[in-house]
């Protein structure tokens, strides 16, 4: 008996909210094929929209020739994702105001209609006030930077919880955190800055909606729009951070800048730990997860690999066909930059450059790379 877990994108609407995860438990072992991917995409659409429609365009897949599903979790990948750290992160985040474990919902009627044993989705529409799993990442990395700064300045070890309530605002109030975003990561950083007591400057590109910009401004962030794509906004944020002595809280990484993005993505593993507990011993055979720069996909891959070892599921990474930097990188066996308009309905996935940290994990651990 096979099973499938799908992690949906951060902007798929479900009755006005955001759907984050979909799990499918199948009656039979699923061989990976274009047809299988098409079926799973239909499951995702059903879970998100509550009605069926066709996926327009050709689905292209590439199998990773470097994959060894029998391998245990490599020691050298722990510097990018380490499941043993998740409980300490979870203990901190549980103390934040408004924390609650988000539900894994059983879509029994849809499963029955499709003759599937079980379908679940991880409903992140209830994650803090941001209604996104991204709340676990940018805000956590922001808190970590402030925690380290205050510990140095006071010459004593403080917890992230100690930052709440404005106790150290006199030390942190003039610090500026910055990032580039398509929306939800920037909201997470802005929320973290407001929660833990520092300033925030967010860079957005030309395709980010005014509503998303307003949402970040409502959290106290200064928002700067540039005339370029997401990757251009990443470069601009990094350049201005040097010029104005700001700290970049990015969810993408590159050689020489890996530690803060690791904090961002390790925050996401809190959601994955919840999923493992909620599955109550069941293990999916396949996991479908969307990707932009690859941060979430890498955490899904690495965390489940570390927890389930050689019993881990196959990880299928899904990208827009016009922004398939991970698939092209997998074909070549090294990071590849995809240029052009990167046009896609899923603006949050319109990324042309792979995150350095994410690539280290996905190059070894992902099974297939699919574009839609």
Task: Please tell me what each predicted stretch does.
Residues 5, 19, 27-29, 33, ...:
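Short hydrophobic targeting helices and cationic amphipathic motifs
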Residues 2-9, 16, 21:
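Intrinsically disordered, low-complexity segments enriched in small polar residues
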Residues 28, 37-39, 49, 58:
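N-terminal leader/targeting signatures
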Residues 47-372:
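PLP-dependent amino-acid enzyme catalytic core
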Residues 8, 13, 38-41:
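Residues marking helix boundaries in flexible regions
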